[in-house]
């Protein structure tokens, strides 16, 4: 999964119709892997909100689906970067924390979203890093509660089929996944890279 980011370049305009300097996207389209591009206005309204929001995804999912949502950690480990990751300014051999989670309804057990993160832990305070490693809390909530100055920059949005590797939804049937990749800038440096995927059939 980390390899997904290795061939990306800093100029992300082609994959992101939601850049702030471009204004309202209007009739923009997003890419569908292996198929025709999709006009953004055809996406369910709440999914459009999720693609552009700058806040805690867990809380907005709770408000929309009206049940508690928990972060279920599926994978978390330190790995050396095999190749450069331009979006994070990571060099080969640099140690990063990779993390894969599901955002699941506590009562329904439905997986509303899946997220994969690459984190440069050496660039965050020790207390933040330890809470992250201990899996005590989600990244968005942790940043909010830490009081650190940060902002999110959306880099890429698109639609791809679920293939069992990118984000299994535990649903009775496979679903197209609407995704966004963004990075979190802290103290002027890219520190966290996250791809969130949302099963389309749950939001239609």
Residue spans of the language-model regions?
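N-terminal domain-onset segments
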Residues: 1-98, 102-178, 185-204
């Amino acid at each position: 999964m980390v390899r997904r980011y290795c061939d990306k370049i800093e100029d992300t305009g082609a994959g992101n119709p939601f850049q702030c300097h471009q204004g309202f996207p209007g009739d923009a389209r997003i890419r569908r892997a292996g198929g025709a591009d999709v006009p953004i206005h055809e996406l369910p309204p709440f999914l459009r909100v999720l693609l552009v929001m700058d806040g805690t995804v867990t809380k907005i999912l709770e408000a929309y689906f009206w049940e508690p949502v928990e972060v279920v950690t599926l994978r978390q480990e330190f790995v050396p970067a095999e190749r450069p990751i331009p979006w994070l300014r990571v060099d080969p051999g640099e140690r990063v924390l990779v993390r894969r989670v599901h955002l699941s309804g506590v009562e329904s057990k439905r997986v509303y979203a899946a997220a994969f993160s690459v984190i440069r832990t050496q660039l965050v305070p020790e207390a933040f890093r330890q809470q992250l490693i201990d899996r005590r809390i989600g990244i968005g909530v942790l940043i909010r509660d830490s009081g650190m100055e940060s902002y999110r920059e959306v880099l890429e949005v698109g639609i791809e089929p679920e293939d069992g590797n990118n984000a299994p939804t535990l649903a009775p049937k496979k679903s197209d996944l609407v995704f966004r990749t963004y990075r979190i800038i802290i103290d002027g440096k890219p520190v966290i890279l996250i791809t969130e995927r949302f099963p389309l059939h749950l939001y239609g």
